Amino acid sequence: MHPVLCGLAANPALPAELIDRLIAVADTAVDSALALRPDLSHVQMVALASRADDTAVQLAYVGRLTAPDVDPVAQPRAALALLDKRSGRPEWARLFAMDPAVEHREKLAACPGLPPDVVETLAADPDVRVVAELALWTTADMAARLASHPHAEVRRALAANEATPPAVLAMLVTGEGLPPAERCLVCDREATPFVHDQECSLTDCDLPPGASCDGSHESTVHDMQLAALRNPATPAGAVVGFADHPSMLLREQLAARSDLPPEVAGRLVDDPDAGVRGELAENPSIGDAQIRALAADHGYDVRRRLAHNPRVPLDVLDQLAAEIRISSHPLPRIAAASPAEVEEMARSKNPALRMVLAERRDLPNGIRDALALDPDAKVVKSIARHPGLSEAQLRAMVDRHRVRVIAKVAANPDASAALLEDLAGHEPPGHKVFREIARHRNATAPSLLACLASRDARSLAAGHPALPPHVMVELLSHDDWQVAEAAASNPSLPPAVMSELVPGR
């Protein structure tokens, strides 16, 4: 990979004639960067696609190649990508359905809208991987037909397909109405009973760690049950019995279901595994009784996840905010709070609750301004990025709380160039402040030059258009490839310098 050429390939100011020269000399990494450019001509896109299959696939998926641009024999992966986007030709599907390469048939099986005869061919494919891939993506009618397939891997894939009819999903879970599966990937390869080594060292082995079969295909059945529990189309009545299953993974997925009956949720509140209770805590379908019981849970992570439940009552959230460390992202319950609830939280005596409220970016001006004057630095850090704060308010925050808030102040979209320059020279320097300055639209040359001294911010500063051009040129030869690439991608890089960097003049 050539970082400077990769940077130039992504540079929005790169002249059209240099794009042509770059295409002629590009490697795979540069091709990928060029393929993302919105200003490529059709001729340039076709030229790029002809150089590397990966690039052709990339261009096909973003809709920049069409069927006339692709030869399915020379570029099979690009043709399959177009089929996956419903932009390929039906005859291609028939060609790939008979392709000796299993990976091509498997990819085809995942494509939507295939001709019926192609679907029938794939359903009868001799390789179970192809049939399983079809089962994962096929329509309800074919899913119902494949439910009695003798291979457990096909049934596992059907259990994950949301188009599989609910009645069929129930049969897959309970086994009622279906003949027993005859084979699985484990007993296809090994004499049973067999348990695959968790630390298998064979490089050509693709069995999952711990995969096992004693004749009942137990690990595949477990995976099928797990897929069915994750599938919202599976009827709740078919899976409630997993509340007492010995598998923690199955109970976790049951606890996360949006159609969980209240009586089952009540049983899972007392589950011995904290992971199960944590899934339940985040589930917006649980009732007030379960929420309040989980608020008293001894598991820290259970209470943390409960705080992210969009239906948690504010009095419970008040309690949780005082007990646990909550992420800086707005909580769903806070985001959904009514105007009256917002006012109530802004007056809370609990600074942790005021802090999570301050993470919102749509607060009324009066509440925003009141939180900007909060005596608690945690609250001020949260509100500092809120749009609409004046320069005087931002400077007052820094005067009161100093290094504890300067990175958040620097992240405010309305921070002025003068304020950013002052923050860049603040003593002591704040953690992360240089990264925030380097990515800020209002940053000027003096503050960006200060950012270059920070290893964490250097590459961001190198790509900022306000950096002096002579500094960009110096950074093109920097030891850190990310810095050199960022400098080359800078739209303020002089065109003459760009031309010198691209071979083929």
Predicted regions and their residues:
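Alpha-helical scaffold segments
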Residues: 1-505
